[in-house]
Amino acid sequence: MEAMAASTSLPDPGDFDRNVPRICGVCGDRATGFHFNAMTCEGCKGFFRRSMKRKALFTCPFNGDCRITKDNRRHCQACRLKRCVDIGMMKEFILTDEEVQRKREMIMKRKEEEALKDSLRPKLSEEQQHIIAILLDAHHKTYDPTYADFRDFRPPIRADVSTGSYSPRPTLSFSGDSSSNSDLYTPSLDMMEPASFSTMDLNEEGSDDPSVTLDLSPLSMLPHLADLVSYSIQKVIGFAKMIPGFRDLTSDDQIVLLKSSAIEVIMLRSNQSFTLDDMSWDCGSQDYKYDITDVSRAGHTLELIEPLIKFQVGLKKLNLHEEEHVLLMAICIVSPDRPGVQDAKLVEAIQDRLSNTLQTYIRCRHPPPGSHQLYAKMIQKLADLRSLNEEHSKQYRSLSFQPENSMKLTPLVLEVFGNEIS
C-alpha cells in the first residue's frame, strides 16, 4: 500500500471537528482518541503497546506493503506495526506498569474526592425548590417589566417653576378595559374617604381615585409618583399573599408586616429598573424615566435621595439572580422584629425557612467570586432599608402634614404610610 505521510508531532485535538467521525489511522476503524501521539482505535492502541513492551520482531510473509483494514489487521502484524509507526505512534508515550498503576490510583482517588465533595456540597431540598418556584411565580404575576400600567397614572409633570412651563407628558386615556380601569379614577379626591386597610381584605387589586389636574407647583411630580407608589403597594400585597406561610399569619400580623415593609420592598423592586449608566429608574419610555430631580419634585430631600441612590447602586452591583432577589423581598416582608407583630415566633419560623433557602441557593447556584460574602451583603441591604424607611417616614410626615400635599396622595398611600391630617 502507499505510505501515508508520517507525523511525529503531537496533534492538536482542537484541529478536529467533534461532529466528524474520527477514523483510526492504522486500520480505518472508529477511533476513540489520541493514543501514543496518533488517532487510533482501541484495538490498534493495545496492539502497539503490547508490541513495544515485548520488543516484538515481526516479519511480513508477503512483500512488506500489506494494506491494513479493520477486517484483516490481524493477518500481518509486521505491516500493522509499521503502519502504527508511520502515522506517528511513539513508544516513548507508553507508560510502564508502575506508571499505569499510579495513574489508575490517581484516577480512583480523584473520583473518590469528587464523590465526597459532591456528598458534602449543599443541595436545595424539594421544599426549598418549591419555595423558590412559588416566589418566582409570585414576582412574575406582580411585576410587569413593560410598565404598561404607568400610562393609567396621573401624568408626570416636570415643571419649571421659574417659567411656569412643564415638560411633555403622555396623553391620558381612560378608555381601556372597564373591568380593570373604570374604578381607578374619579374627578375629585375630596369626595373620597381613606379606605381602611383592614377592610381591604389585603386586595392587591384595590382601587385608588386620584384627581387629574395640571400641577405647576414645586411638587409637580407628587401626583404621578403617588400613583406609582400606590400601584406598587398593591403589587407588594399581591406578592406577599403568595409567600409560603404568609397566609398562616393572623390578619392583624399580615397588615402590620405589609404596612411596615411596603416602602422597603418598593425600593427593592425598583432596583430592577435602576440603571447604573445615569443613576435613574428606566421604566420603558422617556416619560417614565425617573431621576433624582423627579424624586425631589415629589417632596423628598437629599437626606433620603442620596442614601437611596447609594443603596440602589450597591444592590445593583451585587448582580443578584432573580431567585435571590425574590427571596430577599420575601425575607424583608416577613420580619419578626416589626413593631406590632403579635406572633413573632411564627413570623420568625417563616423567615428562617426563607433565609435558609437563600443561603443554600447561594452556595449551590451562585458561582464565585460573586457568591463571596453575598448572603452577609444582602442582609446588610435589609439594614440599609430600615434606615431608608425611617427617613422616608420622617419626610412623608412632613409632606403629608400640608393639606395641599395630602390631597394629592391616594387613599392606599394615606392608609399605609399614615394620614397626618386629622
From Swiss-Prot:
Annotated region (Hinge), positions in chain: 97-126
GO molecular function: bile acid nuclear receptor activity; calcitriol binding; DNA binding; lithocholic acid binding; nuclear receptor activity; nuclear retinoid X receptor binding; nuclear steroid receptor activity; vitamin D response element binding
Region spans: Disordered: 161-185
PTM text: Ubiquitinated by UBR5, leading to its degradation: UBR5 specifically recognizes and binds ligand-bound VDR when it is not associated with coactivators (NCOAs). In presence of NCOAs, the UBR5-degron is not accessible, preventing its ubiquitination and degradation.
Short name of any one Pfam family annotated for the protein: zf-C4
Zinc finger residue ranges, NR C4-type: 24-44, 60-84
InterPro entries, per database record: DBD_VDR, NHR-like_dom_sf, Nucl_hrmn_rcpt_lig-bd, Nuclear_hormone_rcpt_NR1, Nuclear_hrmn_rcpt, VitD_rcpt, Znf_hrmn_rcpt, Znf_NHR/GATA
Induction (free text): By 1,25-dihydroxyvitamin D(3) in kidney.
Span of the annotated motif 9aaTAD: 411-419
Biological function: Nuclear receptor for calcitriol, the active form of vitamin D3 which mediates the action of this vitamin on cells. Enters the nucleus upon vitamin D3 binding where it forms heterodimers with the retinoid X receptor/RXR. The VDR-RXR heterodimers bind to specific response elements on DNA and activate the transcription of vitamin D3-responsive target genes. Plays a central role in calcium homeostasis. Also functions as a receptor for the secondary bile acid lithocholic acid (LCA) and its metabolites.
This protein's name: Vitamin D3 receptor
